[in-house]
Amino acid sequence: MDLNTILIIVGIVALVALIVHGLWSNRREKSKYFDKANKFDRTSPTSRSHTQEEMVQPNNISPNTYVENGHTPISQPTTEKLPSEAELIDYRQSDKSVDDIKISIPNTQPIYDMGNHRSEPIQPTQPQYDMPTANNVASMTLEQLEAQSQNVGFNGINSSSPELRVQLAELSHEEHQVDYNLSFNEPKAETTAQPKQTTGYIQLYLIPKSSEEFNGAKLVQALENLGFILGKDEMYHRHLDLSVASPVLFSVANLEQPGTFNAYNLAEFNTIGIVLFMQLPSPGNNLANLRMMMRAAHTLAEDLQGVILTEEQEIFDANAEQAYLARV
């Protein structure tokens, strides 16, 4: 009886020990699993970065390299070489940016670059033309003169003048009758040419249409809009490149004595008129500068409701304009 009791007690103790050992073993296995899981989370940024890099090129990835549902991979790691970070960067940078794109036509060189290119501003230059002399004009045919006038452009000779066309036709007819073996030293027939003005001043007056006077504020605004600068002798000057350091092409003076503009009272004064004048010889081309002064006079007349007069105080019409141009 005592032996049976002892065996029962020993069996119960053994059973309890087995149960306790089983529970303890189970908890230890769970503890190891969670430790590994926590360790994977701590290193997961690197693993996730490799996973994202692998997903960029899915054709080169083995299914064994993915981690599913937070579990560690069961299979052995593959020996396949993953793309390095430098190679991945080169791959991502292989696409050209918009600035590198060039538009071109087939079988031709690129004609336009989409990149941001800043070109230096082109400074305006005063065109210089070689004006033909009177002797050269006399020796030209009408067709040659018209061709040269088209090449010269704005500063060319006005070949539409009836008198000039008649003279050229007569000279051309005479030259065709002369032997072509004549020496260049032989005297040529002199042509009557109007003498050009090379010194002095060319002037244009601008007065109001009515008996009223020009308002100082409006006059100053109109002059400044045309690029005039108040400078030497208290007059407005039109410079070559709109800076006081460049030469003066033509100027504007007040008709009232002493002909100046008070810099400290420009907004309050009135005047009966102004005079535009150009001194010869002028910087650059006299004819081009005279045309520019005429355009400025016409613009001022429109802005200020004025009338342009010649030096003889006559209306500056088309005939007077041609006479002015013929002077230079």
Curated annotation (Swiss-Prot):
Q: Where is this region: Disordered?
A: 39-79
Q: Which CDD domains match?
A: ZipA
Q: Name one Pfam family in it.
A: ZipA_C
Q: Does the keyword Transport apply?
A: no
Highest taxon, organism lineage? Bacteria
Q: According to its record, what are the GO cellular component terms?
A: cell division site; plasma membrane
The UniProt record lists the keyword Hydrolase = no
Chain ranges sitting on the Cytoplasmic side read 26-328
Transmembrane stretches, by residue range? 5-25
Q: Which UniProt keywords apply?
A: Cell cycle, Cell division, Cell inner membrane, Cell membrane, Membrane, Transmembrane, Transmembrane helix
**Which portions of the chain have biased composition (kind: Polar residues)?**
57-79
UniProt topological domain (Periplasmic) ranges? 1-4
One Gene Ontology term from the biological process aspect of the record: division septum assembly
Q: Which SMART domains does the entry mention?
A: ZipA_C (SM00771)
Q: Where in the cell is it found?
A: Cell inner membrane
Function, please? Essential cell division protein that stabilizes the FtsZ protofilaments by cross-linking them and that serves as a cytoplasmic membrane anchor for the Z ring. Also required for the recruitment to the septal ring of downstream cell division proteins.
NCBIfam families from the xrefs?
Answer: septum_zipA
Quaternary context: Interacts with FtsZ via their C-terminal domains.
Provide the protein name. Answer: Cell division protein ZipA
Q: What is the originating organism of this protein? A: Haemophilus influenzae (strain 86-028NP)
Gene from which the chain derives: zipA
